Every structure is written in structure tokens, then in C-alpha cells.
Amino acid sequence: MEFDPDAVRSLLRGQQIATLPELKGALGSSATMTVFRTLKRLGYRTSYSHRGKYYTLAEIPRFDARGLWTCRAVGFSREGTLLATAQRFVDEADAGVTAGELHELLSVDVKGPLVRLYRRRRIDREDLGG
């Protein structure tokens, strides 16, 4: 059975972001894979905040100079995931960046992603304590 991607396109153009249950409702399908096939066909982005549970069309975000876009307190990044976003900010910071600075910038807890990046040897860590 073929599902009409216009239902998803219309929903997302109207409210800008949606969750998987909302997208399933728009398509009239309970199948997760049907939603993801439709999103892939349309081109989409996943939120870095809220554990990636929000979706938008790739054409919708208007990213700021930092590569971030927020809609109704849901964060999206050019990099996509929180892990990739955190790594970019660390990599681009000449003097490094603290977890607190990243938290303030991204409005989400970044300690877990920073630990994962460190354990994977993708970032270094310095103790700034006196």
C-alpha cells in the first residue's frame, strides 16, 4: 500500500515539528517504517534535544550562525545528533569549551555525550579545577 507523503508534508509545514505518533496519525499508518520511508523521501531532520523524538522537513529549519534552530523549545542542529553537535562545538573552540558552556548553548544536558566522545577518543579532557 502506498502512502501519500503530502499528509506528512502538510502536517510539518503547518506545525513545523512533530513526533512519531503525530506522523503516524497524519499518514494513517501504525507502521514506524512507513513513516521513516516517507520522511526519507521528503528529506528530514531529527531533533538533538528530547532524545531525538521530534522531526521536521529538511527545508524548514532556519539555522542561526551557530548552526542551531529551535522550535517550541525543541533543538535542531545542522549536525543532526547531540553527539555530533557537541563534538563540533568542542572542535571549533580555540580554548576548549566546558560542559556548562555547552549546556547553556544547547539547553540540554551534555555530560553523557561528552563522556561518550571522550571514551571514544574523539575529544580530550582537561581538569580546570584549582
Set out the residue ranges of the language-model regions.
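Eukaryotic partner-binding/assembly regions in large regulatory complexes
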Residues: M1-K53
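Short loop/turn and capping residues at structural boundaries
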Residues: L23, H50-R51, E101, P113-L114, ...
